[in-house]
UniProtKB/Swiss-Prot annotation:
The keyword Protein biosynthesis applies. The keyword Phosphoprotein does not apply. PANTHER family: LD18447P. It is found in: Cytoplasm. This is Peptide chain release factor 1. The modification N5-methylglutamine is found at Q235. Belongs to the prokaryotic/mitochondrial release factor family.
């Protein structure tokens, strides 16, 4: 008995063959690039399907051998051991294919608008926000992505009260989307003379970079104000009105941008951030309803949820959504072991999707 619907596998193989045939015909440069990209995404799945069918065929041969009364005891014992190994391999490939066939988030391949804000904890929270930004920056470099700071408000003792950066790279949102939420740190500050552990927090928001066609924003729904940029002490640092504040009246969402001397650039940056926030606000509303129905631990969309604790004295990082603790805090903060947490969260999310499919079937 097949563990997967064979008709669906036939359709996949036929689609793959069709793409390869199209690639051999005369197509334009844009179509060629599109076909190559789709084939590159599909190839690992097709390889798994072919391996699954090959293992199934081999298991069928062993079944026939075991069903043959003429098979002697020694051969039967060898066949049974081989049958068990093939069954396990077949089940593993079937699970791999099921995961690959799960519905993809339409935003997974988008760039990311990463927003980090210091929360409770004063200067220590700002320092922690800086640590988190550098962690994501180093992780991005390891992925081959680029990071560009869009806006930053530095803390009094270092770090950031708020920092917004654009992370550009294939699959950036897919990897980082589960990082949204409250991150908590427990450590002894440099200024602490009694050796007491302080707790502070920072909030991370990971928003997919959306285009104008993704969000319908009516010009009448925007209030755009210009002003002179201000420094840390409130003094004006620019003689021209280059700073921009844009308010989306229906939602009350507001973005202020003054990092560039160019009003045009500040306005473009503010609109990019505003589009992402409007889209994200609607997705949070949808996700909160869905997660309440499914009782999902990962991807609930709740930004007020404490998702992770970084305990420096114990050298551990705990993700509270999946009860996973890694005693690799230096490696996580360095961006090197962050992928282990991200992979575990992705696996948990996929398991929830598979369970939902099973319940719906």
């Amino acid at each position: 008995m097949s563990l997967l619907p064979e008709t669906k596998l036939d359709v996949l193989l036929a689609h793959h063959a069709s793409l390869e045939n199209q690639l051999q015909s005369q197509v334009g440069a844009d179509t060629y690039v599109k076909l190559m990209r789709e084939l590159a995404e599909l190839n690992p799945l097709i390889e798994a399907v072919k391996a699954y069918r090959q293992v199934g065929a081999e298991r069928g041969e062993i079944d026939a051998l075991l069903a043959d009364a003429a098979t002697d005891a020694e051969m039967r014992a060898m066949a049974e051991a081989e049958h068990a190994a093939l069954e396990a391999q077949e089940a593993e490939l079937a699970q791999q294919i099921r995961v690959a066939l799960l519905p993809k988030d339409a935003m997974d391949d988008r760039n990311v608008m990463l927003e980090i804000r210091a929360g409770t904890g004063g200067d220590e929270a700002s320092l922690f926000a800086g640590d988190l930004f550098r962690m994501y920056e180093k992780f991005a470099v390891l992925q081959g992505w680029s990071v560009e700071v869009v806006s930053a408000s530095e803390g009094t003792m270092g770090g950031y009260k708020e920092i917004i950066a654009e992370v550009k790279g294939r699959g950036a949102f897919a990897k980082l989307k589960f990082e949204s939420g409250v991150h908590r740190v427990q450590r002894v500050p440099d200024t602490e003379t009694q050796g007491r552990i302080h707790t502070s927090a920072a909030t991370v928001a990971v928003l997919p970079e959306v285009e104008e066609v993704d969000v319908d924003i009516k010009p009448d729904d925007l209030r755009i104000e210009t002003m002179r940029a201000q420094g840390a002490g409130g003094q004006h640092v620019n003689k021209t009105e280059s700073a921009i504040r844009i308010t989306h009246i229906p939602t009350g969402l507001q973005v202020m941008m003054q990092d560039s001397r160019s009003q045009h650039k500040n306005r473009a940056s503010a609109m990019n951030i505003l589009r992402s926030r409007i889209y994200d606000a609607e997705q949070q509303r949808i996700d909160s309803v869905r997660s309440a129905e499914r009782k999902e631990k990962v991807g609930s969309g709740d930004r007020s949820e404490r998702i992770r604790t970084y305990n420096f004295p114990q050298g551990r990082v705990t993700d509270h959504r999946i009860n996973l603790t890694l005693y690799k805090l230096p490696q996580v903060i360095a961006g090197e072991a962050l992928g282990e947490l991200i992979d575990a969260l992705t696996t948990e999310h996929q398991a929830a999707q598979l369970a939902a499919q099973g319940n719906a079937a």
